Amino acid sequence: MRVAIPLTGTRGDVQPAVALGLELVGRGHEVVVGAPPNLVGFVERAGLKAQTCGPDVQQLYSSEAGQRALAAGSSFRLMRLVGEQMAEYADRMNREVIEVCEGAEVIVSTMLTEDRAHPVATAMGVPLVSMHGFPCRSNGAYPFPGALPPHWSPPAMVNRASWALAENLRRLVFARYLNRLRRELGLPPTMASTAAQMARDGVPEVQIYDPALVPGLPQQWGSRRPFVGFLPLERAAREAVGELATEHADVVSWLEADEPPVYFGFGSMPIRDTGAVLGMVERVCAQLGVRGLVSAGWSDLDVADARTDSRVKVVVGPLAHDLVFPRCAAAVHHGGIGTTFESLRAGLATLVCSVSFDQPMWGGQVERLGVGAHVSFARLTEDLLTEGARRILRPEVGQRAREFATRLQSHADATVRTADIVEKTAARA
């Protein structure tokens, strides 16, 4: 069976689908992945066939406009920025998604590509499965991520209203470009949202995050939205992409040389002054009497600027969270679902410094569940970072985090379960 997986976004958006693709290849299927130009190499090193699909989102976020939008912490502002980029890239991405899906017997999308994957699947007459890394459908338990302050607990009616507003805004922003694609595919135009069309067609929407993170939500959704947990990369793929490189021996040696440090992961945070951020981390660690491990991710943090003392270590490039987190005392990061899952799975109290999209929601959930704290990166100051780090280092918070880790379902079978859903969906078509 030929499986097409058109993707866009950052590595965090792409990696779970790569894990699924490798599982499907292991079952004898032919898999082709569409990936942003900056991640084609990552997909190929992991062991999958890749084609270019979509813009370089990292480049967009690193631009001056992207950095301003990220620093503002507004999901709606980022949605507008992405909409503007789509206006420039729409026709090209339409072609790229069509090319990736050519000859496919089943298509697997994510929330970021289902707008295009659904009409392509409809025109081709093949089934579609979509993977969602956060709650991105209307519900009464949680508002649209970023629409309301994360610490609010509004009634179900308000939550559903936030989804209606966001979905209508998204529909209006993207309708023109998507109807252009529909015309190219020989489909009639529509003003119905992608969510409504997928519900009409019974498309499976696999929730690739843990249900323990969203109490009350699984009960609101039926079997069309199964919760499978986070999809990890297998060890061989991680070695191939450099996540278990020899540099980790030096990191592990440093970790084990003294007391467990606090992990600071910057991920895609909009860092404009590297020296100031590193200085802030140093002062916070000194004030709290702890060591700090700083992971730069693909932010603009430059190790050349890392004029740190021996109690703060800076690492640039891929970092194996499952090797590092069990050796840490607590974690501070941007709140992407992959990093959030790994820090909580390791039993670490977690401070989320959210930027945008789903991150404020995960930060709010970490705080609401009593296993950490949350602050918007746009509001982050040295005092707030110190206060948040002090909070997650409290023994009672750490104990709750360790207890919560036992409630997270095993992620070992998440990829297998998702592959089963893909195969069963294709078999029913």
What are these regions (language model features)?
Residues 39-41, 57-61, 130, 134-141, ...:
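Short gly/pro/ser/thr-enriched loop/turn and capping motifs at secondary-structure boundaries
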Residues 48, 124-127, 203, 290, ...:
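A short helix->loop->beta-strand "cap" motif at the edges of active sites that frequently abuts
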Residues 88-159, 211-214:
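Conserved nucleotide-sugar donor-interacting segment of glycosyltransferase catalytic cores
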Residues 34-36, 53, 110, 131-134, ...:
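Generic beta-sheet signal
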